[in-house]
């Protein structure tokens, strides 16, 4: 158990002990003083904090303070009833002093003053603090969903990071818990005020009965003694109660700001100094009315007039400082003219026309931000990389229903939606035409039609894939991101991935990175894999493979081939159709010719041969994959794979080029075409 926890538990035990065990008058004085000190400290603390959540333990503090006062009430009542006949000092000096001070030698006056004090505490302060707590709790809880949606919207729009969103959600949860707890804690104060009245009555009546009936005191002496003691006891407990009630009210009415309460009130009251001047004039006029006391009103009028003068001087000084600051800023701007920093482009940006704003505005029912959040999670899970925040903004230069997707500030693609319509996409198995506006699917560039909702069921029956406008945008965005993951992967993100892996395999990562394999090579290899759509989830295998071959070569492209072989099972299964790998292959003659070009460093001839001789034949063979419903795959030897892929990528990006070395041994391969030069 930690020291702080021990002292809290010990304090609670001692407070509860005071209820049962009789305590001497001196110790009671010390404890009553402690109660007042504790309450005063809490009150002053609420004045200096700037945010109520800085004192989130206040409800618990309030409970402990109430428990302390009640235990002292019981202890004091016990001493009054047992030792009251000994005199007003029987319950200690603190209670005696409070009782005599208020009573002023007249017990009736003392009782009336005490009751007034109780009324002020119970009806004004306590009742007000309780109501404030109830309203604050209700409005805080009512606003909770809206605040959560606002955080999600800021996150989806890229205005805040994941860490900032998490921190805000935690603060929101803490705020809701705080005000809910304050609503309940305010009941402690109210009950404490009621208990004070009951204890006063019991102490007074019980004391009189014991003093007169048992101790043999005369009526006048008993009334005076027990009234002073009862009033003193009540005040000694109600003064700290009043302080804590005020603290509760101050805390629940405090708004979050950069200033403490004193600074906030001072600044706001002095914003309009004319109010001080008018008040001074009114008080001066009242002071001159015959029959009214002149000195107090004129004195207060003079004080307010002086305050007005001082505030005016302060405002003038503040304005001068602001003007000087503005002048300095302008000078600095002139000095830095022509040296402005060029802002870095956002990794991913979605720009929309004004008519598409409802699709991205969650307050209007737009689902795009939520779907984008899910999309980032899905891609991260599928490919093992961190997808950057996607920034959404409107662009008045676009058509009303148009959007465009930018990667690092460069436009990758754009498309025009038809909100309220559905996109019917012909995947090749549609049984007939459908009435609609002819267009294409932006993600896969397949022929499609915009149809109205009443045609949706008909299109589905004909074999069309039917999706709404939001899904079209999200699918398009998804494909653009997947095709550009290699560009989005930065070295910083690679280091983050390695750091996450090190939490699970610290020794392996420490041994490999960066002692054996530098970050730059890991970055290039991961980019190469992502460029061809290979997930990098299995980062451990990738690092271990790089460590095995780094002594043989430092070429990232060649190292990528070794990594692909290590990931053979994963790569093979990406392209299986019903357990079979359908592929076209290069003929032995073509393979031999390509290898010869590479060995003789005849790269220009290699490229010319692939583009002019092989590419047309590859395109002719690719059409065969449709009848099998398979992903197009070209098989080559390991020596030429990466060079063939690099050459044909701009023309056939959807064609996967695999080498025999990176295929799973037990895989069932079906060659459906041979690429030959004849």
Swiss-Prot record:
Its main location: membrane. The keyword Signal does not apply. GO terms for biological process: bacterial-type flagellum assembly; protein secretion. It is a multi-pass membrane protein. Required for formation of the rod structure of the flagellar apparatus. Together with FliI and FliH, may constitute the export apparatus of flagellin. Belongs to the FHIPEP (flagella/HR/invasion proteins export pore) family. This is Flagellar biosynthesis protein FlhA. The gene is flhA.
